[in-house]
Amino acid sequence: MLRVATAECFTHGFVGREIHASASGYTGELGSEILGTELEGKVSVVAACFIPTVSGLRSLLGIDPPEPDEVSKSGAKAYREETDRKVAVMMARAVRERTGADVGIGTTAGIGRGAICLDDGEITLLGRTDVHANLLKPDERIRKRQLQGIKRSLVMFRAYFRCELDELLEEEWVEEVTRDLP
């Protein structure tokens, strides 16, 4: 059984929830629109964490992320896009290692497009949203970016689960792939 853990910021834990719904065979309102029941009995969610703050990243994941460019009124970190990409990788790797999962998924978005990372210790996939938004200036783009981030995270995980990485890499939103081959 494939074990997955998520450390999520702008996707608010919904990626882990959707994977769990599919793995549990939930249908209807409880089910996953994107994954269906494809993962039933084949995947286990070790943890699905919503971690919007730097202090949360430090205490829960044991990482030392860069200081945020800005901080929201609620204390949420707000990095610019380039730093979000680096932090998403840190989050995915740390949640995988910390929980003993086979796969870690990290998502974060502050100012710009959202960053999505999937890491299994050998393969690191880095994707992004197309939607630009600013966490410090909330408007409808925040929600659009979140929904696209959830969908793309699930599409990325599904491609990984199905061993369809070559097809995934044809998507323009998958920015980087690192394969550490023996």
From Swiss-Prot:
Highest taxon of source: Archaea
A Pfam entry, by short name: HcgF
Family, per entry: Belongs to the UPF0254 family.
Protein name as it appears in the record: UPF0254 protein MK0012
Organism: Methanopyrus kandleri (strain AV19 / DSM 6324 / JCM 9639 / NBRC 100938)
